[in-house]
Amino acid sequence: MEGDAPVIAANPLEKNTDPMVALQKVIKESLAVQGVARGLHETVKALDKRTARLCVLASNCDEPNFVRLVKALATEHNIPLIEVPDNKALGEWAGLCKLDKDLAARKVVACSTLVIKTFGKESDDYKFLMEYISKQ
């Protein structure tokens, strides 16, 4: 088989370069250890008590007062803030959905904001996300 191109195997340990994918995995790991507070009320309580270690805000939140409040509390208490483009995607990442038999998300509830109070294990995605936040 002289004309065949060499087959290059994908590296399974390839580092992630997309912060949204890394954020999704970090949220999933935090959900496993009950370290996520979802919604405005829980987020504001965690930000006030300074138990939040990372705040995530949906940029398409329909209430501008929510956005101002969360941004102000996060900056006042020096808690890193990441904005995601879609509140439906954030709701799916936060587990606010039903899964069908094919494990596809159904009936996704929009989530305007969430905070991570406890990270799961310190994975490569966690390290990448913290490095990304420190560069901002």
From Swiss-Prot:
It holds the Pfam family Ribosomal_L7Ae. Keywords: Ribonucleoprotein, Ribosomal protein. One of its GO terms (cellular component) is phagocytic vesicle. It comes from the Eukaryota. GO terms for biological process: maintenance of translational fidelity; response to bacterium; ribosomal small subunit biogenesis. GO terms for molecular function: structural constituent of ribosome. Belongs to the eukaryotic ribosomal protein eS12 family. This is Small ribosomal subunit protein eS12. It comes from Dictyostelium discoideum. The lineage of its organism: Eukaryota, Amoebozoa, Evosea, Eumycetozoa, Dictyostelia.
